């Protein structure tokens, strides 16, 4: 078994870590940064950019630059959350055949797991460049409050990217692993995780290598992106009041505004006020317009007050479900970039009545925890037991459209529960099992995560046949459901892939596409490297030909020029092998020129040496004036 990497697949940024010599190490990407923007862009010439490269060109290519795709993963197009995103997204969100939310870029539709896979491939490449070996195994983190569909979609993304996902682990749980690995004393901690797109709160008990999650709660549509949006709306409204132009109608201006608002938000974590300056943001008949606005920390807090208020209830529910009061919590751990905001820290202090612990890096701690979990699975990290929970209740629809829960929320996983049901009508030949996830009493108010039928039930009065329904949640928090007719022994089972998730055929196709794209990327890299080397050779040959061409015969000179022209023509093409061959041909043809240059250099050195010896031989000779004396005149 090779190295197991830990990946924090974030809404705004992603991070990768690995265990090295018993210690987790965060790996910097090719640009030298320890986190990578979770962005994918498609350029006009068909190139795909991921990470920092995608972010750099977002302003000039807003419609084809995808960000915060994690907010769409495992979601229906018709859901309220997606509807809200459609209003503000510069790229096009469309309805897939299965009802999911997909994106349409340059006339091609992509599923969120496919886009996430591109980000995962970038993280995989980062790890491989650092380790110098191929990586196939990974532990990937998800928000604790992700439902079954979202977890399955994340696992699909891993598969599409060419990774073998050993475990899906909750982000707060990963953070607790990073925090408590070396702690021996027993303590109760709250992990407050507010990232770019999601909010989680988990209550855990740590002690002697056991990490037990007592409860979890959260909001999968609350994070830094929402704070940015509130600031953008405020700034756009102020600009409209002043200039009469709504920047929200201009996608390019909106992308510039988004970046400026995000920067201002970050700056206000350390300073009391900042300026948002965007020259030439737009124009009308009177000429160009500039945006210049001063934003104070107190104004930012009032703009985002409704979002800050949303942080309270999940914390209260998590404490209640864990059977604890705020005073029972020993430490509150801050995770996610948004927890750097002073107002968020003040809200945490208000909820828990204590100063939060800022001892971990909020951007890296989740990836570090994932790497530690990878070490646990590989056997590198000993004496660690992780007991996670399922965030939402699971059950089936029964007579009267009621949801009958088989597994309650905050049940430790893996777990298995069975219950016996019967038919609702006489001589009923089949039972439809409608699998639900959520906390509401009525089936229609909860999320459908799968349906299947158990057929072939022998005719009998209602209430007589006995059908055993079994729910089995694995360590990834992914559900497997089976139904068995105890009378005939007939069984029907499904692994819940979400009622609208990707089919195995679709995943296989996406895996092939990703592999093809990977080989395309490799070929592009080969071409670029071959061109770069050829360009260097062509430049030095041309320079030498200009300076020393007169020292070789005309035939040799013509041969070199022909080989040079052939190489330049090859560099225009896309065949790296052809470029390499033409480079070798030019190198061979240039041998005589190189000899002439070498000979001249040697002759020059010899001449300089002789001149040096001559001057050295004259050393000790003193020039003196002299006067002839006429002896006779004495």
Swiss-Prot record:
Acts as a chaperone. Residues 620-634 have a biased composition (Acidic residues). Pfam families: HSP70. The gene is dnaK. Induction: By stress conditions e.g. heat shock. It comes from Syntrophotalea carbinolica (strain DSM 2380 / NBRC 103641 / GraBd1). Residues 599-634 are annotated as: Disordered. Belongs to the heat shock protein 70 family. This is Chaperone protein DnaK.
């Amino acid at each position: 078994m090779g190295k197991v990497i830990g990946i924090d697949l974030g809404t705004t940024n992603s991070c990768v870590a690995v265990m090295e010599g018993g210690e987790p190490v965060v790996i910097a990407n090719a640009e030298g940064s320890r986190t990578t923007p979770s962005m994918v862009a498609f350029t006009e010439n068909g190139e795909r950019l991921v990470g920092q490269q995608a972010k750099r060109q977002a302003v000039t290519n807003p419609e084809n630059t995808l960000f915060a795709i994690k907010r769409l993963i495992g979601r229906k197009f018709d859901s309220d959350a997606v509807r809200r995103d459609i209003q503000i997204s510069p790229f096009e969100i469309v309805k897939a055949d299965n009802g999911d939310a997909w994106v349409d870029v340059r006339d091609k539709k992509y599923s969120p797991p496919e886009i996430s896979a591109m980000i995962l491939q970038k993280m995989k490449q980062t790890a491989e460049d650092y380790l110098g070996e191929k990586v196939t195994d990974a532990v990937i983190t998800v928000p604790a409050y992700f439902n079954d569909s979202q977890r399955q979609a994340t696992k699909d993304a891993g598969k599409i990217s060419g990774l073998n996902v050993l475990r899906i682990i909750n982000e707060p749980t990963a953070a607790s692993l990073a925090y408590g690995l070396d702690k021996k004393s027993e303590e109760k901690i709250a992990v407050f995780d507010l990232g770019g797109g999601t909010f989680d709160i988990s209550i855990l008990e740590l002690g002697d290598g056991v990490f037990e999650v007592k409860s979890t709660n959260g909001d999968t549509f609350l994070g830094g992106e929402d704070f940015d949006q509130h600031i953008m709306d405020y700034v756009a409204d102020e600009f409209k009041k002043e200039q009469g132009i709504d920047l929200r109608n201009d996608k390019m201006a909106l992308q510039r505004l988004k970046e400026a608002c995000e920067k201002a938000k970050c700056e206000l974590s350390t300073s009391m006020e900042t300026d948002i300056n965007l020259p030439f943001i737009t124009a009308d008949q009177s000429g160009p317009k500039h945006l210049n606005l001063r934003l104070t920390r107190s104004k930012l807090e009032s703009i985002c007050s409704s979002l800050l208020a949303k942080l309270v209830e999940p914390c209260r529910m998590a404490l209640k479900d864990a059977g604890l009061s705020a005073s029972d919590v020993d430490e509150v751990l801050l995770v996610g970039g948004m927890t750097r905001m002073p107002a968020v820290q003040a809200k945490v202090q208000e909820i828990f009545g204590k100063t939060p612990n800022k001892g971990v890096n909020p951007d890296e701690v989740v990836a570090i925890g994932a790497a530690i979990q990878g070490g646990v699975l590989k056997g590198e990290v000993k004496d660690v037991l992780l007991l996670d929970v399922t965030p939402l209740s699971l059950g089936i629809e029964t007579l009267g459209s009621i949801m009958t829960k088989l597994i309650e929320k905050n049940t430790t996983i893996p777990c298995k529960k069975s219950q016996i049901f019967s038919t609702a009508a006489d001589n009923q030949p089949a039972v439809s099992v409608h699998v639900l996830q959520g906390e509401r009493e009525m089936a229609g108010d909860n999320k459908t995560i799968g349906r299947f039928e158990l057929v072939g039930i022998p005719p009998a009065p209602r209430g007589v046949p006995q059908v055993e329904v079994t729910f089995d949640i694995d360590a990834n928090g992914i559900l497997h459901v089976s139904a068995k007719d105890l009378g005939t022994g007939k069984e029907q089972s499904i692994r819940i892939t979400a009622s609208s998730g990707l089919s195995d055929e679709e995943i296989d196709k996406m895996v092939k596409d990703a592999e093809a794209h990977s080989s395309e990327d490799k070929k592009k890299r080969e071409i670029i490297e071959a061109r770069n080397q050829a360009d260097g050779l062509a430049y030095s040959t041309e320079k030498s030909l200009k300076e020393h061409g007169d020292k070789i015969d005309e035939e040799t000179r013509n041969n070199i020029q022909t080989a040079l022209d052939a190489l330049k023509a090859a560099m225009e093409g896309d065949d790296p092998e052809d470029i390499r061959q033409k480079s070798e041909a030019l190198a061979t043809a240039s041998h005589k020129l190189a000899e002439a240059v070498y000979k001249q250099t040697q002759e020059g050195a010899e001449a300089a040496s002789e001149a040096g010896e001559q001057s050295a031989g004259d050393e000790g000779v003193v020039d003196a004036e002299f006067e002839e004396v006429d002896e006779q005149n004495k």
